[in-house]
Amino acid sequence: MADQQKAGGCPVMHGAMTQVGESNLDMWPNALNLDILHQHDRKPDPMGEGFNYREEVKKLDLDAVKQDLHQLMTDSQAWWPADWGHYGGLMIRMAWHAAGTYRVADGRGGGGTGNQRFAPINSWPDNVNLDKARRLLWPIKKKYGNRLSWADLIILAGNVAYESMGLKTFGFSLGREDIWHPEKDIYWGSEKEWLAPSDSEDSRYGEDRASLENPLAAVMMGLIYVNPEGVDGNPDPLRTAEDVRITFERMAMNDEETVALTAGGHTVGKCHGNGDVENLGPDPESADVEEQGLGWNNKVTRGVGRDTVSSGIEGAWTTYPTRWDNGYFHLLLNYEWELTKSPAGAWQWEPVDIKEEDKPVDVEDPSIRLNPIMTDADMAMKMDPAYRKISERFYNDPAYFDEVFARAWFKLTHRDLGPRTRYIGPEAPQEDLIWQDPVPAGRTDYDVEALKAKIADSGLSIGEMVSTAWDSARTFRGSDNRGGANGARIRLAPQKDWEGNEPERLSKVLGVLEGIAADAGASLADTIVLAGNVGIEQAARAAGHDITVPFAPGRGDASQEMTDVDSFQYLEPLADGYRNWVKKEYAVQPEEMMLDRTQLMGLTAPEMTVLVGGMRVLGTNHGGTKHGVLTDREGQLTNDFFVNLTDMAYTWKPVGSNRYEIRQRSSDAVKWTATRVDLVFGSNSILRSYAEVYAQDDNREKFVHDFVAAWTKVMNADRFDLVA
């Protein structure tokens, strides 16, 4: 039959969807996207179950890798020649644009996963020709194989590039594990086109620049930071300064770090715009198969060397673009600059009456000197009063600039790696930095059973103990490895005053647990978690299950001085579906906020399901509300939530915003009340399938064991000392 196929017909009998077409979310756009909870599992991972990158990378000869990288920097390839014979600027841009996607609001983005290899980031307009940088690195990745991830190599290449040009870097840590497909959880914006202006449909802006939609940091879809030509492509350094400040604040950088990173990033390398942008081919994801994953290929003109087109802006920022020095500030502050356009038609600034010796040479012919350039963002470093003051200090104190930049670069490239306990390798700095959320080591030599007995006799209720432990641990974000129960920061500002933590109830519970912890010689962090375990064990016994909740001592107690209050504000929960609470009404539904929190905590959909069902019957609702407490046996760890939610003896009636009554069909009498977060486990077809499992008569014990396993996972999420 094969030879009878019609020309153009599909030989596959459509047994599986192998191309992207209409998905369930296309057909039902308001459905919960549970896929974000099940990304990056082992199925697409070619390394297999037994592979542990964080153990494998410890075998890496870092010195040998760095030696190879140093050699690569000046080994210009004919297929993509190095500017001035040095790839440093290209490698720094690659590393910068990997790390620079990080945003502090949700901890997502950053260089910790090697996601620059995949769409959409590999094809962003701001990343034109970074595919060439990664291909230049391929021989090194191939050589060191499983001991060196792409994520580590990309950042390391940027670090070595700076070192090769004369900067003393602050340090470097290995340990970034690659993903194998694009993330599904990161919201990059709602725009339907690249570089859509701020007045477009689905804009990320409201009335002013400060209204940039959370959690976004970049000003446009497809940019890493700000538009280098100006706001919406209109040059105005003071307006651009506002964008720069907002964007870098959302990357957890202050003004001094912002100036240092801008200047340090533009001390080396150049922009590329000596040609017609229209001559560039499709981006990597859109390119034909014979392009082998390379994009933006110019098949009309030469398209490499001095004729390369990337951003469209053309020129170097400094006189010596392959040397770390203070030349950026020398040119920026000592010359007047005028607005011009590049050969590609992009807005840029060029100096007026510049001395010939201050001009950089051509990338291919050192006998030719050309004007340096500044972007609108660079001019903001001169025109904005606060940025200008910092720029002048850096100009007058080069050693101070070197130190601030080295530290800011380290922060940029390591922010999403988490605390120092996760650092690997001989170049990992030993200094504790406040943005790492340091936690001192805790004790493990106390009597855990004696401590449990004292907690059990404390008079605290099951709900009080479980809620406090949960609130302490739920701040964990797997996106940037921040938050969690370790450190007991729930007793410190700002967490002790968060509405979601019920400050009055929290103060009472902590007052009891602090004394017990001190008497036992245990940390408060351990005691809070252990109290939650005690509450669960009591509730399980009351339901007829004798179970011990696993516990690993060793958490420490952080001090207020170790806690960056401003940075921790971003970890404040605005809703917690597990405790059936929403701070106020938002544009997104409560169940969507629960899904986002679940993904950040690293939980699966079944784990989310069993935890919600268990928390409801333990009396942990915020403020003691009874919404979703679908049981007559509160305080016992039963599967009643699922049994009653799936029971067709009841109907569900809306009675207000996010409020429902569960009524008996036979009498229409109100039996319970609930919220959307409760009812979604019966209405969403996937979540209902999990709810039915836990409602089954033969799964009462499975429910308890699964709840305890998921609970323990949350309590230990930030225990990096327990894993490789």
UniProtKB/Swiss-Prot annotation:
Cofactor(s) needed: heme b
Active site, per annotation: 97 (proton acceptor)
GO MF entries: catalase activity; heme binding; metal ion binding
The keyword Metal-binding appears for this protein: yes
Catalytic function, reaction form: H2O2 + AH2 = A + 2 H2O; 2 H2O2 = O2 + 2 H2O
InterPro entries: Catalase_peroxidase, Haem_peroxidase, Haem_peroxidase_sf, Peroxidases_AS
SUPFAM superfamilies: Heme-dependent peroxidases (SSF48113)
Covalent crosslink: Tryptophyl-tyrosyl-methioninium (Trp-Tyr) (with M-251): 96-225
Modification after translation, per record: Formation of the three residue Trp-Tyr-Met cross-link is important for the catalase, but not the peroxidase activity of the enzyme.
EC number per UniProt: 1.11.1.21
Annotated keywords: Heme, Hydrogen peroxide, Iron, Metal-binding, Oxidoreductase, Peroxidase
Positions of crosslink type Tryptophyl-tyrosyl-methioninium (Tyr-Met) (with W-96): 225-251
Annotated heme b binding sites: 266
Residues flagged as site, Transition state stabilizer: 93
A matching Pfam family: peroxidase
First and last residue of the signal peptide: none
Keyword Cytoplasm listed: no
Gene Ontology, cellular component aspect: cytosol
Cofactor mode of binding and number, as noted: Binds 1 heme b (iron(II)-protoporphyrin IX) group per dimer.
GO biological process: cellular response to hydrogen peroxide; hydrogen peroxide catabolic process
Enzyme class label: oxidoreductase
Domain of life: Bacteria
Oligomer status and interactors: Homodimer or homotetramer.
Job of this protein: Bifunctional enzyme with both catalase and broad-spectrum peroxidase activity.
Family: Belongs to the peroxidase family. Peroxidase/catalase subfamily.
Protein name per Swiss-Prot or TrEMBL: Catalase-peroxidase
